[in-house]
A protein has these predicted regions:
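Substrate-binding pocket helix/loop in short-chain dehydrogenase/reductase
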Residues: 3-4, 8-13
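Residue(s) in the substrate-gating loop at a strand-loop-helix junction
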Residues: 47
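Active-site helix of classical SDR
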Residues: 27, 63
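Active-site loop immediately N-terminal to the catalytic Tyr-X3-Lys motif
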Residues: 5, 52-58, 62
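SDR active-site lid
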Residues: 80-146
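Active-site-adjacent segment of SDR/Rossmann-fold oxidoreductases
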Residues: 52, 73-83
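A short helix-coil junction within the Rossmann-fold of NAD(P)-dependent oxidoreductases
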Residues: 29-38
Length: 172
């Protein structure tokens, strides 16, 4: 977690390899089996950070936006094979994710954010995820209704200028 100007480019490479290319490679390995079967369902975890911009998340958000672009394109390609694609975009969920965040030099950041303390419980998030997969939803945002992240996704989708106006004023 850091501003782009302070972030070593190696952090981008590390995150792309870990959070993007590993998912693409795994999908490539599994897709042929699904095509041969004539059906399947790909469900992958992304993030609200792949749907809305946030300061100090340039590296992380770019990876998550890349995943959304990849899977949205893939969805169009595999529909003809009866293969569904579900993107799971968590907002604030109580996790230990902050223990693994990296700073500008690629070292552990070591600071939890509000979502890790006050977000949705993992059990409740799992129920939403399982329901989305069962019903072959295109995408699900996992977040409390009161969560700014959910509201941010909504505002950004329908009122992008308003989103950036507000985002400049809110310290996220």
């Amino acid at each position: 977690q850091s501003y782009f100007e302070d972030t070593d480019i190696s952090v981008f490479h590390e995150l792309m390899n870990l959070d993007y290319f590993s998912v693409v490679y795994f999908t490539k390995a599994m897709l042929n089996h699904m095509v041969k079967e004539g059906s399947g369902h790909i469900a992958t975890n992304t993030s609200v950070a792949g749907l809305i911009a946030s300061r100090e998340r340039t590296a992380y958000s770019s990876v998550k936006f890349a995943l959304h672009g990849f899977f949205d394109s893939l969805r169009l390609e595999v529909m003809k094979h009866n293969i569904a694609v579900t993107l799971i975009a968590p907002g604030k969920v109580v996790t230990n994710f902050g223990d693994n965040k990296l700073d500008a030099q690629g070292k552990p950041f070591g600071e939890k954010n509000m979502g890790e303390a006050y977000g949705m419980s993992p059990a409740k998030a799992a129920k939403f995820i399982l329901s989305a997969i069962k019903h072959k939803k295109r995408q699900i945002v996992i977040s409390k209704w009161s969560d700014v992240a959910w509201l941010g996704v909504f505002i950004n989708k329908f009122f992008p200028s308003l989103y950036f106006f507000l985002a400049r004023r809110i310290n996220t």
